[in-house]
Structures are given as C-alpha cells and as structure tokens.
Design a protein with these regions (language model features):
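Short, small-residue alpha-helix embedded
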Residues: 141-142, 201-225
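Acidic-glycine-rich active-site phosphate/pyrophosphate-binding loop
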Residues: 1-2, 8, 19, 179-194
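Short pre-catalytic strand/loop immediately N-terminal to key active-site residues, enriched for Gly-Thr
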Residues: 10-15, 192-205
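Conserved phosphate/ATP/ADP-binding segment of small-molecule kinases
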Residues: 115-191
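Conserved N-terminal subdomain of the carbohydrate kinase-like
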Residues: 2-8, 20-109, 256-257
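Juxtamembrane transmembrane-helix boundary motif
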Residues: 77, 91-118, 129-139, 164
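Charged C-terminal helix
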Residues: 53, 226-257
C-alpha cells in the first residue's frame, strides 16, 4: 500500500463519539494517515445540541490547502449547508477514480438544524461521483421520497437511489424493522445482500460515521465493496458493544477483535 492518505470531510462532535473523531480513530486503526476538512462544529447549549457550520470561506481555504495532497480514499460525512456541500462536490469531482464513501447525513439524531429539504437535492448530485452511499433509514426515505416499513421497501428504496446515480447503496435499517435485529440492505446495482446482527441496546452515537469511514478504509486497502461493507458492519457492532454515554468505542472494538 504505497499511498495510505485518506480524507474525511466531516464535522466535530464535541463529545467525540462521532464525526471527525470517529473517522480519525477508524483510519488510525486501519493503519492509515487520516486528514480532515472540518465542515462544522457542535455544542450542547441551552437550546440543545446545536450544529454550527464552518464559514464558507474558511471551508474553501481548508479544501484549497489540501489541493495538492494525493488521497487514496475519501469519506464524506455531515455537510451542514448547501454551500458547504457544493464546495465538497467540486473537490471530489477533481479526483476521479478515488474511492469515495458518502454518508448522506440529513437528520441528526439530536437536532433538526440541518436544512433537510435543500440538502436532499444537493446530496443527490454527489451520487454519480461516489463509490457507495450509506444512508440510515430516515435518510433513505427522504432521498428516495418514499416510506420504508418493510424489507422489500428497503430494497425498493435502494434500487431507486441506484437509479438516481449511486453506483452502490447500503441502507442502515437499525432496529426499525425488527426489535431484536439490526437489518441493513446492500445493493450493488445487480444483487441485494441483507446483513443482520442482534440489536445491542444502548448508546450508538458515531456508528454511522465509523461505518462509512471503515468502508472507505477497506476500499483504500483493496477490498471489494461487499467485503468492505461486511467487515465494517462487524467492526461497528463490536464498537457499539463497548459504547459509553458519549458514543461507540473504536479502539476497544479493535482490541476485542
């Protein structure tokens, strides 16, 4: 592996369970050199958990600083505004052939500050330029414009997102379809794969970030997409099992591998 440089375009979780903390921890555990362009800051205020987007000019300066860095993989997380998303899209368009994993964060668990309706259409523009998208079930509903109540609904939504331009889709169903199983659906444009794990009760902040950054790490190292997804799901499952009140624990998950 000659080039182990991998980038995360993601926000800062003040409690370090998700966002860039999860991305960098996952990259480190995979032996990779992680870079970050920060899309937003977060804080717990009297209003609740708030997201503060990075100023457009500052975010562009971040990306300009990385213009000459040769990345072998990119993971995209929370893009809090359309303007930040536009700049991120321009950045990845300049890197054809680099594996890109898009975690299309549209609904934060803690807040509705993200402008969901505007970001939907902007994120769809990313689809032809990424390797795989990893929406959770509510995000898949918004992007596909349909309700998802059954496994067949998940498959139909994955097909629709593929038709919108995503080469591959994995919808993270969590325990919405089953109380005792976490069910995900992976679609590569030809075949569906259903992935299941027993549900672990407790804090899972950072699970989606870790999942996407783990997939990006495995793609960089040469794994095929399905293998990357399966390995990443297993890793996240172990990390959730080690979670504390601030989120999942990547390092402990790796030690218990």
């Amino acid at each position: 592996m000659k080039n182990n440089r991998i980038l995360a375009l993601s926000g800062n979780d003040i409690f370090s369970g998700g966002g860039l903390s999860a991305d960098l921890a996952t990259y480190t555990l995979n032996g990779l050199h992680g870079f970050v362009a920060v899309t937003c800051l977060t804080a717990l205020t009297e209003k609740g958990f708030e997201v503060f987007p990075t100023d457009d000019t500052i975010f562009q300066h971040e990306l300009d600083s990385l213009r000459d860095v040769e990345f072998a993989g990119i993971k995209i997380g929370l893009l809090p505004t359309v303007s930040v998303a536009e700049k991120a899209l321009d950045f990845i368009k300049q890197r054809p052939g680099v594996p890109v994993v898009l975690d299309p964060v549209l609904v934060c668990k803690e807040t509705h500050d993200v402008a969901v309706s505007e970001l939907c259409q902007e994120l769809i523009r990313f689809f032809p330029h990424v390797s795989v998208i990893t929406p959770n079930l509510p995000e898949a509903e918004l992007l596909a414009g349909q309700e998802i109540k059954t496994l067949e609904d998940m498959k139909a939504a994955a097909q629709k997102l593929h038709d919108l331009g995503a080469p591959a889709v994995i919808i993270k169903g969590g325990n919405r379809l089953s109380q005792d199983k976490a069910v995900d659906v992976f679609y590569d444009g030809q075949n569906f794969t259903v992935l299941e794990n027993p549900v672990i009760q407790g804090q899972n902040a950072g699970a989606g970030c870790t999942f996407a950054s783990s997939i990006a790490s495995h793609l960089l190292k040469g794994d095929d997409l399905l293998s990357a997804v399966e390995s990443s799901k297993a890793f996240v499952y172990r990390a959730i099992a080690q979670a504390d009140q601030y989120g999942i624990r990547q390092y402990e998950a790796n030690q218990n591998n």
